[in-house]
From Swiss-Prot:
Record's protein name: Isopenicillin N synthase
Binding residues for Fe(2+): H213, D215, H269
Cofactor(s) needed: Fe cation; L-ascorbate
Record's keyword terms, sorted: Antibiotic biosynthesis, Iron, Metal-binding, Oxidoreductase, Vitamin C
Annotated organism of origin: Streptantibioticus cattleyicolor (Streptomyces cattleya)
Recorded catalytic activity of this chain's protein: N-[(5S)-5-amino-5-carboxypentanoyl]-L-cysteinyl-D-valine + O2 = isopenicillin N + 2 H2O
Length: 321
């Protein structure tokens, strides 16, 4: 059962001291501020992150023009259960039933010569992008964005601090060469009329575009438009989260809950139905295939520890639930 979060408060934290600063005092202060929301709503906004948000939004908006159902741009790379790509690719909408469409891509370091690729290890794939001549720089910018977020401490700073607070050593850091991290570009379209069959209904009667779920990740770094549609489940019921067009929304994934017996739980969240054109760009931070997830005893009380597993095993199991 998901853990009900104590609040829906989402503070904004300046993470520039952790990224660019050398003075240890503001760096410690910034890290400490990111710990509190992990025990509150499970979310916080990261400001002063150094990413060119306008360029990112322009890149994201380009995908909207390419997802027109009359275009074959994405269709040639679409995901289906019969091909070898089980993560990367275009997930098509289903007219009249499913309106949301998305594009997922993985670590650009996964080339044909990568050891995991040669071994045929699941969840390791070479990215397939739309035609570069028709869409110049689209694939290159996407892979640049993946590298910037995963290789820097933009997202790792929060995860590392949360792990240390709960008692874990810092031996399982994310490496650019092996991370299983993924980016999803999710389009919620405006439609007139909007098909009723595509709208879900929550137990409380709220109309939804995406039902409640936990993120199977270390943490999730989200860039989204300022359309208010995200909610978190709290002890006081479902509460709406604030929006920001400039800052990244960061939340705990199930990884931290697994290691800490939910001392740092993954927040249960959902997307309300809003008939408005919008894009959501979550970056799911993952460790490498062979990183060992060893739960630790601090802050677990008398609860039984979860078994130690490799991150690859944990992630693959999470995808099959």
């Amino acid at each position: 059962m998901p853990v009900l979060m104590p609040s829906a408060d989402v503070p904004t934290i300046d993470i520039s001291p952790q990224l660019f600063g050398t003075d240890p005092t503001p760096r410690r202060t910034s890290r400490g501020r990111s710990t509190r929301p992990a025990r509150g709503s499970g979310f916080f906004y990261a400001s002063h992150h150094g990413i060119d948000v306008r360029r990112l939004q322009t890149w994201s908006n380009e995908s909207t023009t390419m997802t027109d159902q009359r275009s074959t741009t994405w269709r040639s790379t679409r995901y289906n259960e019969n091909n070898s790509h089980v993560r990367n690719g275009y997930y098509m909408a289903r007219p009249g039933r499913e309106t949301v469409e998305s594009w997922c891509y993985l670590n650009p370091s996964f080339g044909e010569d990568h050891p995991m690729m040669k071994a045929g290890t699941p969840m390791h794939e070479v990215n397939v992008w739309p035609d570069e001549e028709r869409h110049p720089d689209f694939g290159s910018f996407g892979e640049q964005y993946h590298r910037e977020v995963s290789a820097s401490r933009r997202c790792c700073c929060g995860a590392s601090r949360w792990r240390r607070q709960a008692g874990e050593s810092s031996s399982n850091e994310v490496t650019e060469e092996d991370t299983l991290s993924a980016v999803s570009m999710i389009r919620y379209p405006y439609l007139d009329p909007y098909p009723e069959a595509a709208i879900k209904t929550g137990p409380d009667g709220t109309r939804l575009s995406f039902e409640d779920h936990l993120d199977v990740s270390m943490i999730t770094v989200l860039s989204k438009t300022e359309v208010q549609n995200l909610q978190v489940e709290t002890v006081d019921g479902w509460q709406s989260l604030p929006t920001s067009g400039e800052n990244f929304l960061i939340n705990c994934g199930t990884y931290l809950g697994y290691l800490t017996n939910d001392y740092f739980p993954a927040p249960n969240h959902r997307v309300k139905y809003v008939n408005a054109e919008r894009l959501s760009l979550p970056f799911f931070l993952h460790a490498g295939q062979n990183s060992v997830m060893k739960p630790f005893t601090r802050r677990t009380g008398d609860r039984k520890l979860n078994p130690a597993v490799t991150y690859g095993e944990y992630l693959q199991e999470g995808f099959t639930r």
